[in-house]
Amino acid sequence: NANTASTTSSDCLDASAGHYVDSTAGTAQTTQTACIAGTYNANTGSTTSSDCLDADAGYYVPTTGQTSQTECAAGTYQASTGQSSCIDADAGYYVPTTGQSSQTECAEGTYQSLTGQSTCIDADPGYYIDAGGSSDQIPCALGTYQPDAGQTSCLDADPGHYVDSTAQTTQTACAAGTYQASTGQSSCNVADAGYYVGSTGQTSQTECAAGTYQASTGQSSCTDADAGYY
């Protein structure tokens, strides 16, 4: 009670919620003390600082004299008690809901490049993510492709096909006159002289038949021998 003319104990005021009056300092107190940031007190008439409660993990109290704690927002967390703020989720992690005491690693196939996020992002087609907690996606290498989002690996180009640049979503069939016997290749082989490849997407070249020839490489057919030749 700060008034000088008070005559009874009823003129003394209870400490407000969010505050206390320290009984160890003796009677005749004229002020109350606010609970510090990171603590709160919902009750009136408190007589000790221990009546101010630490904020729970997953919660915070940002300023002094508070009557309640506040949940950490989605995208943030707080592992410790008695804190005045929450922590942004790291890149590669997320916090999906409020009041959380920990962050969660982005799963394989997903990533998050920013801090303080509540979700992770699927890898784009043409990209992959092969480890948890990733902050970026990885482009598919030459000879590989990925048509789908959210994948952990890329697909090797099939025999008869190739992928000649990174981050591709499709493979390309070898053109007529070329072939590819192996998987995961970035180019096709040109048919040798004396051979041909008659259609697209082939895995081998074909020898010119008797009575035909081919002097050039990379051809899709052979030429009949002229009259008088074989």
Protein language model regions, located:
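Disulfide-rich, cysteine-dense extracellular ectodomains and adjacent flexible linkers of secreted
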Residues: 1-230
